[in-house]
Amino acid sequence: MIALVLGASSQIGYCLLPLLQAEGIEVLALSRRPTRSAPTDVRWLQGALPALPLALPPLRYVFGAGPLDALAAWLPAAPLTPDARVLATSSMSAVSKQDAPVAAERALSMRLRTAEQALAQTCARRGVGCTVLRPTLIYGVGRDRSLTPLARRAQRTRVFALPRGRGLRQPVHAGDVARALLAAALRAQPLDALLEFGGGERLSATQMFARVRASLPFATLGVPLPRALLALAALHPALRGPITRLDQDLIADNARAVAALGVTPRAFHPDARCWGL
């Protein structure tokens, strides 16, 4: 059995590779950038979809941990075994940013939903299984672009900004997303489904930022950001979307995923390793 992992150097790919190795699955790992500290028994391919650097053998599993639209564009010509399964991640941004005030975020939502549909149609046409997860905010191995930058900025400045937000958050660990993808791959029967997948705990945005700060291995000065300052900052196009969502619930309903895959994600209790510190 051969598995191709797309986006293998991403945070999900980082967690997925050792899980596949533990199952005795031969792994081809594709990444756009050379990978340091790569497992020695994984064959690394440098490149990006839809163009691959060399011909591939028939694939039993295709794991998509990179851009979903690129996977959807490449899949029609992919070399798949008759019983192949496609396991990929989209994002809850497909839903949460559908009516965002920023045009680029609305475009991202549309691109994700279009790719989800195209992927499902291609898999149905080719007769292979297709499971797509919509994770919430992913963290855990210091490679995310949401919480890790906050932790590392605090490391440099010893100051931690604390935005106040009433909206609920449900951060999910990259390792739990990887476990869910593997569970979908190893099911006795293929699971053709689009599943929401969040962390094991819902908490306010304010609480989430406070826990990130508490996880740091050094002292910081916590600086609450008043709403008036946030409203002023929201005038900047790059900040408008994130600030607007502070009072919105960005959560997932895990019921279907947990029932189908048997993976229960962990609660949000990060430590310094989650930020690569």
What are these regions (language model features)?
Residues 136-143, 164-174, 199:
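Glycine-rich "substrate-gating" loop/helix at the edge of Rossmann-like oxidoreductase active sites
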Residues 106-131:
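Active-site Tyr-X1-5-Lys
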Residues 29-35:
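N-terminal Rossmann-fold cofactor-binding loop
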Residues 183-241, 259-262, 266-277:
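Mid/C-terminal beta-alpha module of Rossmann-like enzyme folds, strongest
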Residues 6, 30, 65, 86-92, ...:
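SDR active-site strand-loop-helix element
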Residues 152-172, 184:
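A conserved pocket-lining segment of Rossmann-fold NAD(P)-dependent short-chain dehydrogenase/reductase
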